[in-house]
Amino acid sequence: MFETEHHTLLPLLLLPSLLSLLLFLILLKRRNRKTRFNLPPGKSGWPFLGETIGYLKPYTATTLGDFMQQHVSKYGKIYRSNLFGEPTIVSADAGLNRFILQNEGRLFECSYPRSIGGILGKWSMLVLVGDMHRDMRSISLNFLSHARLRTILLKDVERHTLFVLDSWQQNSIFSAQDEAKKFTFNLMAKHIMSMDPGEEETEQLKKEYVTFMKGVVSAPLNLPGTAYHKALQSRATILKFIERKMEERKLDIKEEDQEEEEVKTEDEAEMSKSDHVRKQRTDDDLLGWVLKHSNLSTEQILDLILSLLFAGHETSSVAIALAIFFLQACPKAVEELREEHLEIARAKKELGESELNWDDYKKMDFTQCVINETLRLGNVVRFLHRKALKDVRYKGYDIPSGWKVLPVISAVHLDNSRYDQPNLFNPWRWQQQNNGASSSGSGSFSTWGNNYMPFGGGPRLCAGSELAKLEMAVFIHHLVLKFNWELAEDDKPFAFPFVDFPNGLPIRVSRIL
């Protein structure tokens, strides 16, 4: 009996010694690593949590926030920390940020927290890396091609803009942020799954999506009643909806293929209207294109569509809300915008035209300055998640393999050594920068290299960047021609770190007669 008790107690007696040995080995490893690497200055903060709580503390979106400001002042533009439970190199350095993004897949790799993949899906473009990300991105670029931007997308961007603006009543007060979300969601739902604005199924999907989004930006606690738990439930509902659309579309494509086999050229002219609409739908939206031209699995298609709804709707709506906010405080910019767009409208009237075309878009020079400044000052995407694939040395500092790396885009955009009075909304700074530079075919301007990266860079440059700028330009065109607006109550954008208006950006509008 004594011998049995002795064997039972032995592991318990050895446990403190084993834990002490483990702690010693961890400390020894850390000491060796510090000796081996010349790490940037900084500190790790609390065990496990590190400095994450301070880093994520909300702050005014047009500033760096106390955490970044204090750390950059104390340690410089490259420092080390412990964020999201991992040792991290934080970069407010423009050159390092560009170096990180340009070396995607070679020295660095996209590495978002697991909770993001858990809610967006493992096949989401945001979390994919390597060949699979390249293939998914290729599909998105095809969907957002220059030819489609100039024709189908431009036409529908204007149609959906007017759908929203024409609902605004004289002297009414409403959330500009919600209206911007309505515009971008309706547009993406139309071009991804041919869903029309105002329809019951569109409104129901939008309602589920709002619940889903609250979970994406919440703490990943999968407990009943939490935002994350509700978001996972909404995700399941949204995926069932998309899958039902997929099955309907497969039947449409099958019928279309059968008709092409049976009907000859002379009979195609007599194709019924419903057949024509069905064929146009299977050709024009993303769901139809993916089903007809890719070999993606059902799970991959579901995650792709969900992630495109997220990426194509959320960030663009925030950018439009920011433009509305900045412009209401800058009457001079609104006046110059109005002159630019009145000139375009007069020229169209003389030609007997009403709808905007690509030539009109290319004439929106000052509008592009406003867009550039909105994205620079508002910083819709403030930082990116990356991981070092190899030991990397930069400016004498070492970035160890496996460490997380956070290129903080907003820190460069708000750097007073790179922008004069960076916390002020000044769209004219872009006219000064681009003096003598010609606009590109997309209406965008040459920018300040490393200093301006609102859409990221490198192989993961945002696939929807040109669509986002087109949406903003067309929305601004009709906004300044149709309305004056002002804040109905105090509000301003905060970084949580996602950018949001706490009160929804309530505005009062009056029509221009």
UniProtKB/Swiss-Prot annotation:
Known cofactor(s): heme
Domain of life: Eukaryota
GO molecular function: fatty acid 2-hydroxylase activity; heme binding; iron ion binding; steroid 22S-hydroxylase activity
Keywords, ordered alphabetically: Brassinosteroid biosynthesis, Heme, Iron, Lipid biosynthesis, Lipid metabolism, Membrane, Metal-binding, Monooxygenase, Oxidoreductase, Steroid biosynthesis, Transmembrane, Transmembrane helix
Region (Disordered) residue spans: 252-277
EC class: oxidoreductase
Keyword tRNA processing: no
EC number(s) on file: 1.14.14.178
UniProt-listed Pfam families: p450
Membrane topology annotation: Single-pass membrane protein
Single GO cellular component term: membrane
Pathway: Plant hormone biosynthesis; brassinosteroid biosynthesis
Binding site for heme: 462
Gene3D superfamilies found in the cross-reference section: Cytochrome P450
Record's signal peptide: none
Predominant localisation class: membrane
Entry function: Catalyzes the C22-alpha-hydroxylation step in brassinosteroids biosynthesis. Converts campesterol (CR) to (22S)-22-hydroxycampesterol (22-OHCR, 22-hydroxyCR), campestanol (CN) to 6-deoxycathasterone (6-deoxoCT), and 6-oxocampestanol (6-oxoCN) to cathasterone (CT). Can also use cholesterol and cholestanol as substrates.
PANTHER family per UniProt: CYTOCHROME P450 26 (PTHR24286), STEROID (22S)-HYDROXYLASE (PTHR24286:SF194)
The protein, known as: Steroid (22S)-hydroxylase
Organism encoding this protein: Arabidopsis thaliana (Mouse-ear cress)
Gene coding for it: CYP90B1
